Regions:
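Glycine-rich, charged/polar anion/phosphate-binding loops
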Residues: 60-63, 162
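N-terminal export signals
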Residues: 6-28
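Short beta-strand scaffold segments in enzyme catalytic cores
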Residues: 74-78
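Metal-dependent enolase-superfamily TIM-barrel catalytic cores that perform enediolate-based chemistry
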Residues: 162-196
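Short Gly/Pro-enriched turn/cap motifs at secondary-structure boundaries
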Residues: 64-69
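Metal- or metallocofactor-binding catalytic centers and their adjacent structured scaffolds
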Residues: 41-45, 50, 79, 84-157
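C-terminal segment of N-terminal export signals and the immediately downstream linker at the start
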Residues: 22-59, 79
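N-terminal secretory signal peptides
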Residues: 1-3
Length: 196
């Protein structure tokens, strides 16, 4: 059975059809020009930035116990060699026990910001995410945002979307689901049409 790192090496190799030894990319050795990695030729390091904001909803979101028009959110950016990957930590009030609050997410991301530069490159996904997970229990939204930003960054560096890296057919991807809040029948029909 392949571990995550070996799978990424194999998948990247297959997706890009390269005859270059993929181990060079992941071992931090000289990087083939095929990849969009360390193009500046300097000792690139990852940098994490994060920006809190209030996500304004298009419609009032109502469930049995409350209504809201906003959701606390944090945008996460991980930059490496001039390329930026994006992630997001969303904390709807009814999930804050599991996901964290704005304050806990910001404090957790500050911890990650202080240590992410110790990893030589974003291709060490398994090691980085294991380290991030051990920083503190909980804070699932912040951890997910870092995970998403790292995957976005690696996909950009490999110049391939993840469905190709994983060898998937995007047309066969299952539909996603989400909650349409309680409203009048007319508004629920309108929201449903918007989502179709």
């Amino acid at each position: 059975m392949q571990n995550r790192r070996d799978f990424l090496k194999t998948a990247a190799f297959a997706a890009l059809g390269s005859s270059v030894a993929i181990n060079n990319v992941f071992a931090g050795e000289s990087t083939p020009s095929l990849f969009n990695i360390n193009k500046s030729g300097v000792n690139a390091r990852m940098k994490l930035r994060f920006f809190p904001y209030e996500l304004k909803l298009r419609h009032v979101f109502t469930v049995a116990t409350y209504s809201r028009t906003t959701t606390p959110d944090v945008q996460v950016e991980i930059e490496y060699d001039g390329i930026t990957g994006y992630g997001e930590a969303s904390m709807p009030p009814y999930l804050q026990k599991e996901l964290g609050t704005m304050e806990s997410v910001m404090a957790f991301l500050k911890k990650v910001q202080d240590v992410i530069g110790q990893f030589p490159d974003p291709f060490q996904l398994e090691d980085i995410l294991a380290y991030v997970d051990k920083l503190s229990p909980g804070d699932a939204a912040a951890k997910a945002a870092v995970d998403i930003a790292l995957h976005d960054l690696v996909g950009k560096l490999l110049q391939a979307p993840w469905y190709k890296i994983w060898g998937l057919d995007k047309d066969k991807a299952p539909s996603t689901t989400f909650t349409i809040g309680i409203d009048t029948p007319e508004v629920v029909r309108e929201k449903t049409k918007e989502c179709a």
